[in-house]
């Protein structure tokens, strides 16, 4: 059994490594470098928008900070919600209406609205400090250099909508896949 070992890092689309050993024509080299799918780009080293994979992290932060009561019913808002008119035309949307709107069901239905509300309850200070404790904005201690995960382009959550979007893994949240695996 393997513990705490990275057995493989995968980036797709890929190319045949043997082409480098056998010698590659300039045409093949140019084709690889000009391919719009960028097979030479190491995606596992980059950061990506985590989307719904981030919701359990928000749940853990909310429970740890006491901002979320797992049995509190947030009420069914339908498929679109905004905190108030200060958000202008911006709405958070979700795919499923269900009841009761509690943490367990929000995870089952992957409810963006619930997690946007949860992020607002957590607040920017607790969100920033919790994500910093989880290694955001830090270099991963790994033999291969990885891009740093971030919760904001400026290292600060500056707007309420940004905080709400962070609750469901959107906004300016970017996470390295290896970092996400380590957090889980």
Model-identified regions with their sequence ranges:
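Beta-lactam-recognizing serine transpeptidase/beta-lactamase-like catalytic domain environment
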Residues: 3-52, 57-184
């Amino acid at each position: 059994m393997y513990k705490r070992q990275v057995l493989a890092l995968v980036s797709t689309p890929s190319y045949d490594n043997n082409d480098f050993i056998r010698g590659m024509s300039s045409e093949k080299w140019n084709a690889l470098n000009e391919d719009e799918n960028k097979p030479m780009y190491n995606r596992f080293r980059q950061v990506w928008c985590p989307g719904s994979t981030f919701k359990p992290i928000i749940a853990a932060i909310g429970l740890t900070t006491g901002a979320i009561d797992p049995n509190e019913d947030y009420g069914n808002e339908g498929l679109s919600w905004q905190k108030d008119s200060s958000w202008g035309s911006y709405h958070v949307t979700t795919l499923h209406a269900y009841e009761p709107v509690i943490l367990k069901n929000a995870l089952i239905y992957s409810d963006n609205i619930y997690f946007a509300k949860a992020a607002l309850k957590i607040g920017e200070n607790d969100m920033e400090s919790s994500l910093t404790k989880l290694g955001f904005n830090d270099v991963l201690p790994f033999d291969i250099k990885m891009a740093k995960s971030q919760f904001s382009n400026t290292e600060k959550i500056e707007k309420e909508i940004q905080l709400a979007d962070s609750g469901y893994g959107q906004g300016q949240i970017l996470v390295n896949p290896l970092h996400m695996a380590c957090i889980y």
